[in-house]
Amino acid sequence: MAAHLKKRVYEEFTRVVQQQPLEEPSAKKLRLTKPSKSAALHIDLCKATSPADALQYLLQFARKPVEAESVEGVVRILLEHYYKENDTSVRLKIASLLGLLSKTAGFCPDSIVDDVINTLQNEKSHQVLAQLLDTLLEIGLKLLDIVSHRMRLVDVACKHLSDTSHGVRNKCLQLLGCLGSVEASPAKEVENAVAKDVQKIIGDYFIDQDPRVRTAAIKAMLQLHERGLKLQQAMYNQACKLLTDDYEQVRSAAVELSWVLSQLYSESIVPIPSSNEEIRLVDDAFGKVCHMVSDGSWVVRVQACKLLGSMLQVSPHFLEQTLDKKLMSDLRRKRTAHERAKELYSSGEFSSGRKWGDDAPKEELDTGAVNLIDSGACGAFVHGLEDEMYEVRIAAVESLCLLARSSAPFAEKCLDFLVDMFNDEIEEVRLQSIHTMRKISDNITLREDQLDTVLAVLEDKSRDIREALHELLCCTNVSTKECIQLALVELLKNLSKYPTDRESIWKCLKFLGSRHPTLVLSLVPELLSTHPFFDTPEPDMDDPAYIAVLVLIFNAAKCCPTMPALFSDHTFRHYTYLRDSLSHLVPALNLPSVRWSWIPDVITEAPPEDPSQQFLQLSLERVHNLQHLGSQGTQELLEFTIRDLQRIGELQSDLAGMADFSATYLRCHLLLTKALNEKLWNLAAPLFLKNSLTTNAVKQILEETYKMEFMYSGLETRQVAIIHHMRLQAKALQLLVTARTTKGAEPLFGMCEEFLQEVDFFQRCFISELPHMQDSFVDKLLDLVPRLVNSKPLEMVKILQTTLRQCTFLRLTLPEQIHRASSHIIEPAEESDNPIRFTSGLVVALDVDATLEHVQEPQSTVKVQVVYPDGQVQIIHPKPADFRNPGPGRHRLITQVYLSHTAWTEPCQIEVRLLLAYSSSRSKVMSRASNSTWGESTETVPSTESSTEGTIPFSKPVKVFLMPKPARR
């Protein structure tokens, strides 16, 4: 029995239990809620015990942003308090807030239109009404596509046009101008009726008693025109009447309306008042606008002068009247005293008074019936150019330029007036006059008296004025050889008085000679001081005046093959010297006495194709096909290719950017290849540390990549990716050098983490370029990223070293054109041996004049560096106003650098050069991308990033003697 029980105890029983699946408890969702803006505003307004408190709460609320989903609730709260509020100022602020809220991005105000319109019904305050209408205008501008809302707002505006307040009427007219229908054939009849009457409704307020309403009506009509509605010709007479309004705002708006109608109906015929004649509407409007040049308000005069320049359809007869100097009095020219005396004497009339014929009957004229064309257009530009306000004179000069460019006869007639403006007392007017004459120089030829007046401006102390005049003379035609001689004499005087104008004067004489070769031909013996029988002394080639004369003659000789026969022997020698030193000023001439073998750019038969471009491409292809970059022969081939590319850049200016960019890229590869040489890495750590080849290579590669990125313009996304790929290789090499020369692994943790971030950034930033980088360093690195993340620093260094040696040469593809940023310092000149003396401790101003080529955003990137003999470095950031932009891709820097130092025992040289500042960060790299794929991943870039800043020298240093004198005690 015991055995049986024991067996029962140890017996295992099996039992199948079917359990119902338990329901999973619903996951709790965390919902973040923001405090309700409407509730907070409601509580604040309820706490207000006075209108001043309520106004204060509203002002505080206006400073806080409101989300689009909260706007409607806030509007309801504001409207609720609006109806409860009795104070006008609080209701006015609420109405203003409604307008601000309706402009919230992402909010559609169609749900609050009815509520805002209802607030107008019981409002008695004119100020609040005007503000509510302004709010409706803001709502309507956001609902322009919804015709029903727009037309309802127009009806509201029409309803309140009869208000006694000018502010309400102004807002109604503004609403009509911005929301009135401009469709030619509306779909609905109701809309058609309103659209047909909107011009009439606005036009009825042209005669409103308040000038502010009249101005608003005209501006509303102009707003309709800007929105595409063709204005009716019938309102031209109304616009003409408004030109004589007592208020300048009305006259100013009426002038613009008259001009608009003259452009719409230029060929329409309108009658002349009190006459049976008819003229074109544009001619009539031109005369009326000319009449406004004599308006009492200088604002109206400026606007009238500006509009005259755009009325190009006017008849030549009326256009020429604007330059008529005859003084008009009741349609009669004012005769001189001699002419009046002669007429009186020939008439035979007499009187017993003091004056002969003073009691003779005169024709009575109605001054109100004077022809506006004759009295308006006559002398309009004369009045404008002689106006007391310089703004009017500038506007008149600009309009003269526009009209003269469209009419060659008018350009000839206005020449005397423009030349007279060169003597204006305001520098801005003189400068604008010079620019204007340069623009119309193709249509004019200067006489000797006009040229004399023009050349007098060379005495101006303003550098901008003088250089603008030099540019004018570059494209000016003169009539006689005396004019050429006069221009040369005055330019040489300018050169003597202002030596800093040397480059500008030489350039001016270059174009002056090339435009007038036959006139210069007759002056050659006199200019070169040659004699048919006697030898004359050889002039000094260092004399800038003599160089200026030669530049004039050599450029004229290019178009005059008989001129070289008048040259003396030393002139040919001087030509070869100038052709080599100033090749941009002296052209290539086929002179019989000159050997051409060593002179660049000689006139020869042009090959059918430019071989330089082909040679550049073949050189790059030859390098790309290299397999073993570490061999000695490969490195020598890279060096030869770099040398050839540099030579191409020196000989071919068009290919200089592409050749220099390619040479820099190959130089980086050469440095990287030499730095990875196995013999260097097999050295012991102390010897490796002593041999600084690898460290210098890393530093130089990083510098070259920054130059490639910031000194060259025209780069595409692929070139920028190649630059960053080379920089990534340099940083990997830097990590290897640090691991080789540092004891322990702790300093490497931070560098390894930073390097992995760089790899991640490269992948996200240049993801579209990765397919073009097969078998490159970054391509292999991305495959090894999971392994690198889990590796120790020393293991990661070994992987990087192996990957660097195994990666292939990344092919460099070039865009159509690459330009390299360059600069040339004109002043200070390096040849001066006279030191700049000043008292120690004080400052002296050094004039800096430089030309910049292909520099992007020079106002923020170009700096001036001054290096003193004791090693002190001063970096000056010029003002934005110091930069000028004479042409596309070209800038001019004219500034002053203030120097100061302690006393020296003898004069020493300081170095002045230009620097190009750069700042490279991840966000800026992405923003510079032109490809959309660059900008797609900007959100994933970490906000905390280190920015690399530096400067790149991009001009030759100029040495200037400086001598600080000790202060007298």
Curated annotation (Swiss-Prot):
Q: Give the primary localization class.
A: nucleus
Extent of the HEAT repeats: 68-107, 147-185, 192-230, 231-265, 279-315, 371-407, 408-446, 448-486
The annotated region (Disordered) lies at: 928-950
Presence of keyword Cytoplasm:
yes
Listed GO biological process terms: RNA polymerase II transcription initiation surveillance; snRNA processing
A GO molecular function assigned to this protein is: protein-macromolecule adaptor activity
Compartmental location: Nucleus; Cytoplasm
Pfam families, from UniProt? HEAT_2 (PF13646), INTS4_8HBD (PF24493), INTS4_C (PF25458), PDS5 (PF20168)
Residue ranges annotated as coiled coil are none
Q: Keywords of this protein's UniProt record, alphabetized?
A: Cytoplasm, Nucleus, Repeat
Q: Name one GO cellular component term.
A: cytoplasm
- Residue spans with biased composition (Low complexity)? 928-949
- Describe its assembly: Component of the Integrator complex, composed of core subunits INTS1, INTS2, INTS3, INTS4, INTS5, INTS6, INTS7, INTS8, INTS9/RC74, INTS10, INTS11/CPSF3L, INTS12, INTS13, INTS14 and INTS15. The core complex associates with protein phosphatase 2A subunits PPP2CA and PPP2R1A, to form the Integrator-PP2A (INTAC) complex. INTS4 is part of the RNA endonuclease subcomplex, composed of INTS4, INTS9, INTS11 and inositol hexakisphosphate (InsP6).
**Functional summary from the UniProt entry:** Component of the integrator complex, a multiprotein complex that terminates RNA polymerase II (Pol II) transcription in the promoter-proximal region of genes.
Family label:
Belongs to the Integrator subunit 4 family.
Q: What is this protein called?
A: Integrator complex subunit 4
The record lists the organism as Xenopus laevis
